[in-house]
Amino acid sequence: MSGEKKVISITASCYNEAENLSVFYERWRKVLEQYPAYDYEFVIADNCSTDGSRDILRRLAAEDPKFKVILNSANFGHIRSPYNAIMNASGDLVVSTCSDLQDPPEVFSELLKKYEEGCKVVCAVRSETNANVMMELFRRFYYWLLEKISPGEKVLSGFTGFGIYDRVCIEALKKFNDPYPYFRGMIAEIGFRTVTVPYVQEKRLHGKTKNNLFTLYDMAMTGVVHHTKLPLRLAVSFGVVLGVLSLLISLIYFILKIIWWDTFNLGVAPLVIGLFFFSSVQLLFIGVIGEYLGAVWTQVRNRPLVIEEERINFQGQGKE
């Protein structure tokens, strides 16, 4: 990298993005070339793609020595792989983005302007999206709920991770040593001065989204269990409230039966309804407890973020 220039690191992960990678590189390079005062690098992590993405990444790396590639040995998912790319960026400011180009590179100029004003964290927040209406409503509800139940710094609504992060922030993130990191929440937790820049999230350029109901649920629950103990305390509170309610209902039924012994018929329906209700509540909170136990299990195993098969253009930074 050249002498006194600050280095911008563009980081992303990909899985079967062969149709998007070349356009991703060209659009980002075109944007970066507008800032000759900065040098740049790309750090792209591939999750064991099967559609020829790796061949394209190798070609781009051969054409541009600043294009660094991490080839994972397996698909390590949408949480760990992009975070590993961020952790391996060497730039003075690190940009986290998506390889499907839903985060338009042209927004970078607004992000950089805020960064140069002295902000350590500049988050791009969606003002508009082309997502399904119902999905967007669910997302807004989730962020609203997470904001209400989180005791500390709040996760920004509409923030997907796209933004600029100063090197001091990256070094702070490395101290977490979290094998399953919730990046958006960690950015809120480190506490550096943060500003937001609204942007319109574009449609995926080519191909289909790799997110499904499971991956969205995984991300949502990871955010909850990493940032609040309220669901566990709700389980205790519900247990107490429902226990008291059960005693009161039992007492009322007993009194009514004493008063109208021959005419008051208890019936089967209240028993069945009560059984299903209490069983549902129990299963719900057993599931909540299971999520927290799963998070603890992930932590205590202390496994690496990813297993890397190969690195390209990381001279002096690991195996090539």
Where in the sequence are the language-model features?
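Solvent-exposed polar/charged
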Residues: A62, M87, K113, E117, ...
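Membrane-embedded alpha-helices of multi-pass transport/permease systems
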Residues: A18, Y25, P105-F108, F159, ...
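Residues in soluble alpha-helical coiled-coils and helical-bundle/repeat scaffolds
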Residues: Y15-E19, Q102, E106, K174, ...
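Acceptor/aglycone-binding surface of glycosyltransferases and processive sugar-polymer synthases
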Residues: I70-A74, H78-N88, L93, P105-F183, ...
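Structured catalytic core of nucleotide-sugar glycosyltransferases
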Residues: M1-N132
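Hydrophobic helical membrane-anchoring modules
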Residues: S2-V7, Y182-E320
